[in-house]
Design a protein with these regions (language model features):
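PLP-dependent amino-acid enzyme catalytic core
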Residues: 1-292
Length: 292
């Protein structure tokens, strides 16, 4: 499906990926991985169980796809992620695995590896979607998300220059979208958003409130040579941006989406790059979160 490109004030455009099934941009990668793996025979409906470590959005995307094709989903969800998202994942059919192991200090990846090693004992036939190493995620955003933005932007704005503001967990959506815009003839100024205190390139991470971003590993699919600038955003800044966006549109953004909007607002307030449209992504809705 094609999601909206919402035009806001000051030539800021927001790709409303929260309109996807599953409620986020992660549906794109999940759909591409599952459908491609069914075609290749790596996933057999009614037999295979998907296993993945995810903080919520990719899991919801997997459920949105797998529920239609008869594939079960087992997820290792870090204990720091939204309790509400975990509740939703369970209610829509996911099995949340390894909670006791996580409480004992295992990482979600270690939980996945442990369950894969024990799959025969538990009568499982696992397929690990492995979003941090699966290039089908990047492909989904290059073919779909970025190409949609390019077509929609041409309908709303003349010129070939565009600022793209985004966050990175795996880096799949950032890299895929930027490269798609370049494929369509745009001169892209990519700006990466990080939480205050984080520097993913140099593997510096601190505790923060932007789930799914700067997650403790260098984003594997982020093409660093693409990035023109990195901006950091504080919790107070993204919360103010979320309130401002809600006042203007009536729409409630999730934390990473609000952080991207905070950067867009800051660029406009600084009166730089004024003649160039800004595109950012509403990755998911603020309704998923309970940390206001």
């Amino acid at each position: 499906m094609t999601t909206r490109l919402l035009q806001c004030r000051d030539d800021i455009f927001v790709k409303m990926e929260l309109d996807n099934p599953g409620g986020s941009h992660k549906y794109r990668a999940a759909k591409n991985i599952i459908e491609s793996s069914i075609i290749s025979g790596k996933i057999i409906p009614q037999k295979t169980t998907i296993i993945e470590k995810t903080g919520g959005n990719f899991g919801l995307g997997l459920l949105a796809v797998c529920s239609r094709v008869g594939v079960d989903v087992d997820l290792a969800v870090g204990l720091s992620f939204s309790k509400y998202k975990r509740k939703i994942l369970r209610s829509f059919g996911a099995q949340l695995i390894g909670i006791d192991l996580l409480q004992q200090g295992m990482t979600p990846r270690e939980v996945v590896e442990y369950h894969i090693s024990k799959q025969e004992v538990h009568g499982k036939h696992y397929f690990y979607t492995d979003q941090f190493n699966n290039k089908l995620g990047v492909e989904a955003h290059r073919i779909q998300t970025g190409s949609e933005i390019a077509r929609q932007l041409k309908e709303n704005h003349s010129g070939n220059d565009v600022i793209f503001i985004g966050c990175a967990g795996t880096g799949a959506s950032f890299t895929g979208t930027c490269n798609a815009l370049k494929d369509h003839g745009y001169n892209v100024i990519p700006i990466l958003i990080e939480p205050d205190g984080c520097d993913s390139k140099n593997e510096i991470f601190v505790d923060h409130r932007i789930e799914g971003v700067s997650v403790g590993v260098r984003p594997p699919f982020l093409e660093w040579n693409l990035i023109s600038e990195t901006m950091t955003v504080s919790s107070s800044e993204f919360m103010k941006a979320r309130q401002k966006f809600f006042s203007e549109t009536g729409l409630l953004l999730g934390n990473s989406s609000a952080a991207s909007m905070a950067a867009a607002y800051r660029i406009r307030e600084e009166k730089r790059l004024q003649s160039i449209p800004i595109v950012t992504i509403a990755y998911d809705s603020g309704l998923w979160y309970d940390d206001y």
